[in-house]
Structure formats: structure tokens, C-alpha cells
């Protein structure tokens, strides 16, 4: 027969067995310990609010898992909506002032990284250049309007200009009174007509020079002017008593002999 002390020991051991296997019950001390352990784990993440505020680098040995880092980066990455600016996605964390400071800091860092990585996506809007205004030459305010000459007046002025380009004071006064014009109008018309005649004369001289220019092959030039009488006399010989007209010299390739010896013979 067992003693009472031994029986009590067996009874106590039987009650402690299931309790030891089940573990500590959900008491107030156990809940606080689990919450404290979870908070420590969250604060150890490099992307947590506490880590961003303290700017502490994680140890070299402990590197976060790829899934945790990817989820944390996606939580802090700003949302890009068409037509709106960058908005930060709500990230889990304890509310309060520390969360606001951390959100501002992460937003500035992520915005800078996004601008550096994708410059084409965040290009500034094109500038709308205003059309360049063409500045016209402004005439004088006191400028007199042009005189509308009639056909009969223009014919009389042209006829008088062909007779005499410069009119005296008496001739101008008489001529202007016959055309019902002022002396100033007649004077200005004659000045403009003389300038026009000079321009036409210069243009005609330029055309004559271009027509009289000899047709020489490209790359061929003479060391002397063709129209010079002294050089022409040296070509044809000094014994000629008169100057012969100078003809255009044909290209050198047509004759085997030197220039000038194919058509003319020296005396």
C-alpha cells in the first residue's frame, strides 16, 4: 500500500504532464511577450519606420530576404497615375508624427531615384514657343503720300525727260504749271527718273560685258587681256602697220600647233 506522500506525488506529476505538453496558456504575460517579440522583428527590418528614422544600417551578416525587400520597396514606391503627380502608397506602421516624418523622407528619396532612373518618363512639358513677330520698317509719321500721276502727266514727264534730264528753275516752274503740279513734285520725279535711268544703264553694260566675254574652256585662262591692242600686235607680229581686229581664240585642243599659229602666219 502506497503512502499518502507518494500518491500525492503521482497525482501532481499526472497534472503537470498535460500542462507541460500544452505549454503556457494564453495569459496576460504571454500576450505581452509575443507582441514585444513581433515589434522587435518589425523594427529590425531595414525598410521599417524606425530604421528609416534612425538611419541605422543593418549588419553585414544579416541580409533581408528578397521577398521582404521587394514587398517593402513596393510599399514605399510612389504610385504613378496619368495626369497626376507622384503619390505615396500607404505603408503599414504605427500612426503618429514619426510616421509622417518617415513618409516625407522616403517620398523625397524615391522621387529622386525615379527621376534618375527614368528621365524620359518624367521629361518636363515642352515649351510653347510664341511665334516670332516680324518687325516691319516703320515709316515716318510726317511722310507725304505718293502723288498719283495721271497717264497724260506721266507721258508729258517722260517726253520732257528724254529732251532734257536737268531742268532749270524757270523751266521747272513753267512745266509744273502746265501739268497742274507743284515744282517739288516735278523735281522729285526727275530725281527718281535719273536714278532709274542710271540703274538701267549699269544693267545694260553688265549684259554687254557678259556677251563679249570669250568662250574659253573651263580651267583655261590667258595671261594677257584679249582686247589689248599691244598684246594683239605682239601675237600677229610687229611689222603690221595697222591693228587687225582680234578674234576669239578657239580651244587649244583643236590644233596641234600653239595658239595663234594655226590660222595666221607670222611674216
Curated annotation (Swiss-Prot):
InterPro entries attached to this UniProt entry: HD (IPR001356), HD_metazoa (IPR020479), Homeobox_CS (IPR017970), Homeodomain-like_sf (IPR009057), Msh_Homeobox_Regulators (IPR050674)
GO molecular function: DNA-binding transcription factor activity, RNA polymerase II-specific; RNA polymerase II transcription regulatory region sequence-specific DNA binding; transcription cis-regulatory region binding
Biased composition (Low complexity): 69-84
DNA-binding region per UniProt: 142-201
UniProt keywords, alphabetically: Developmental protein, DNA-binding, Homeobox, Nucleus, Osteogenesis, Repressor, Transcription, Transcription regulation
The keyword Transcription is annotated on this UniProt entry: yes
GO BP field: embryonic morphogenesis; negative regulation of DNA-templated transcription; negative regulation of transcription by RNA polymerase II; osteoblast differentiation; regulation of transcription by RNA polymerase II
Compartments where found: Nucleus
CDD domains on file: homeodomain
Segments for region (Disordered): 1-147
Gene Ontology terms: cellular component: cytosol; nuclear speck; nucleus
Comp. bias (Basic residues): 136-146
Pfam family, one: Homeodomain
Function statement: Acts as a transcriptional regulator in bone development. Represses the ALPL promoter activity and antagonizes the stimulatory effect of DLX5 on ALPL expression during osteoblast differentiation. Probable morphogenetic role. May play a role in limb-pattern formation. In osteoblasts, suppresses transcription driven by the osteocalcin FGF response element (OCFRE). Binds to the homeodomain-response element of the ALPL promoter.
PANTHER family: HOMEOBOX PROTEIN MSX, HOMEOBOX PROTEIN MSX-2
Entry's family note: Belongs to the Msh homeobox family.
Oligomer status and interactors: Interacts with MINT, with XRCC6 (Ku70) and XRCC5 (Ku80).
Protein name per its UniProtKB record: Homeobox protein MSX-2
Lineage, highest ranks first: Eukaryota, Metazoa, Chordata, Craniata, Vertebrata
